[in-house]
Curated annotation (Swiss-Prot):
Region annotated Leucine-zipper, chain positions: 179-193
Biased composition (Polar residues): 96-133
Gene label: BZIP63
Listed name of the protein: Basic leucine zipper 63
Segments of this protein annotated with the region Disordered: 94-177, 253-274
GO biological process per UniProt: cellular response to abscisic acid stimulus; cellular response to glucose stimulus; cellular response to starvation; entrainment of circadian clock
GO cellular component entries: nucleus
Domain bZIP span(s) in chain numbering: 151-214
Consequence when changing residue 164 to D: Impaired DNA-binding to C-box motif
Compartment(s): Nucleus
Stated consequence of mutating residue 168 to D: Impaired DNA-binding to C-box motif
Motif stretch (Nuclear localization signal 2): 295-302
UniProt GO molecular function: DNA binding; DNA-binding transcription factor activity; identical protein binding; kinase binding; protein heterodimerization activity
Length: 314
């Protein structure tokens, strides 16, 4: 509820009389206050129908005679009037009304004065009731209806830019999530490959150690073979490859004797035949001796290998 106060009502000429103030001269602030009240009342008459605000005017007390107290009283009245005008104009004045009133010089002065008073007294802005405030939807609707085509295009362009930026952010987020999953998979594969590499290197190290051990064993076996050969030479005094030669000769001579025994028992064999058979037996023995030389070597080698194996087992 708003009510426009006239200068007579606020100054108190209509409702009360100032005791002993007729003789006082009015200062510049009083004249400015009266001028502001006149301009605000003229602007209120030109505007729309107004409703009374919640400010109730009570019968003012007697105005003090002291000039300083009188100035303080006028200042409080001025603050009340400025608050009422600010509430009215902040609620009902549209941009069209302000553009229409900009042509009037007096209206501009009153608006500037009201703005200055509202800036000087920010505590009066809290007196605006919630019923006088417009909701966000109503303000947006009024803004859309009052916007010109260029503003509409600019708003549409801004909305399209925001939507494209939102889509690009979503695409980037999806791409980053995909890259993170790939990185996690690659890390798992890398860990598996590193584990396999460590296993292979451990196996290689074990194999190399075993190879060195086997080579050392081979060298020791060769040294043992040489020592065994030298020991055999010292004990026998000759090459061990020919120490079984008398046995081989005896085994070779046995078939010749067995082959000659039937010739001696038969009564039909003559002396020249016996001589010729004796010569043939000697030739056979010589051939068998030459043939068995290689056999003796093989047997001696086998015997030596057996002895080396027995020494190695020990």
């Amino acid at each position: 509820m708003e009510k426009v106060f006239s200068d007579e009502e606020i100054s108190g000429n209509h409702h009360w009389s100032v005791n002993g103030m007729t003789s006082l001269n009015r200062s510049a602030s009083e004249w400015a206050f009266n001028r502001f009240i006149q301009e605000s009342s003229a602007a209120a008459d030109d505007g729309e129908s107004t409703t009374a605000c919640g400010v109730s005017v009570s019968s003012p007390p007697n105005v003090p005679v002291d000039s300083e107290e009188y100035r303080a009283f006028l200042k409080s009245k001025l603050n009340l009037a400025c608050a009422a005008v600010a509430m009215k104009r902040g609620t009902f004045i549209k941009p069209q009304d302000t553009s229409g009133r900009s042509d009037n010089g007096g209206a501009n002065e009153s608006e500037q004065a009201s703005l200055a008073s509202s800036k000087a007294t920010p505590m009066m802005s809290s007196a605006i009731t919630s019923g006088s405030e417009l909701s966000g939807d109503e303000e947006e609707a009024d803004g859309e209806t009052n916007m010109n085509p260029t503003n509409v295009k600019r708003v549409k362009r801004m909305l399209s830019n925001r939507e494209s930026a939102r889509r690009s952010r979503r695409r980037k987020q999806a791409h980053l999530s995909e890259l993170e999953t790939q990185v996690s998979q690659l890390r798992v594969e890398n860990s598996k490959l590193m584990k396999g590499l460590t296993d292979v290197t451990q196996t290689f190290n074990d194999a190399s150690v075993e190879n060195r051990v086997l080579k050392a064993n081979i060298e020791t076996l060769r040294a043992k073979v040489k020592m065994a050969e030298e020991t055999v030479k010292r004990l026998t005094g000759f090459n061990p490859m020919f120490h079984n030669m008398p046995q081989i000769v005896s085994t070779v001579s046995l078939p010749s004797e067995t082959s000659n025994s039937p010739d001696t028992t038969s009564s039909q064999v003559t002396t020249p035949e016996i001589i010729s058979s004796g010569n043939k037996g000697k030739a056979l023995i010589g051939c068998k001796m030459n043939r068995t030389a290689s056999m003796r070597r093989v047997e001696s080698l086998e015997h030596l290998q057996k002895r080396i194996r027995s020494v190695g087992d020990q």
